[in-house]
From Swiss-Prot:
One of its GO terms (cellular component) is extracellular space. The gene is CCL14. SUPFAM superfamilies: Interleukin 8-like chemokines (SSF54117). This is C-C motif chemokine 14. Disulfide bonds join 35-59, 36-75. One of its GO terms (molecular function) is chemokine activity. Glycans are attached at residue 26. GO terms for biological process: antimicrobial humoral immune response mediated by antimicrobial peptide; cell chemotaxis; chemokine-mediated signaling pathway; inflammatory response; intracellular calcium ion homeostasis; positive regulation of cell migration; positive regulation of cell population proliferation. Gene3D superfamilies: 2.40.50.40. Belongs to the intercrine beta (chemokine CC) family. Keywords: Cytokine, Disulfide bond, Glycoprotein, Secreted, Signal. The N-terminal processed forms HCC-1(3-74), HCC-1(4-74) and HCC-1(9-74) are produced in small amounts by proteolytic cleavage after secretion in blood. HCC-1(1-74), but not HCC-1(3-74) and HCC-1(4-74), is partially O-glycosylated; the O-linked glycan consists of one Gal-GalNAc disaccharide, further modified by two N-acetylneuraminic acids.
Length: 93
């Protein structure tokens, strides 16, 4: 069986990614992947946001993760006024 030289890095990357996911999920309910290490630098249009959640208190930085209608997760700074306004609006509705 011949394998393309270009396919080898692809399969290696997939193997590493799957191994990393398995390793983090075996540690219990807390996953560092649920933490925000950087915040978005732009304001997300409110109509694109479907839901949000707060990051775990064990994370090194606090964060609010907004889930967009397309299913993307965006880390935001909970002290930004627009983030607080969006949360307030979502709680009221």
């Amino acid at each position: 069986m011949k394998i393309s030289v270009a396919a080898i890095p692809f399969f290696l990357l997939i193997t590493i990614a799957l191994g990393t996911k398995t390793e983090s999920s075996s540690r219990g309910p807390y996953h560092p992947s649920e933490c925000c290490f950087t915040y978005t630098t732009y304001k997300i249009p409110r109509q694109r946001i479907m839901d949000y959640y707060e990051t775990n208190s064990q994370c090194s930085k606090p964060g609010i993760v907004f889930i967009t209608k397309r299913g993307h997760s965006v880390c935001t700074n909970p002290s930004d006024k627009w983030v607080q306004d969006y949360i307030k609006d979502m709680k009221e509705n």
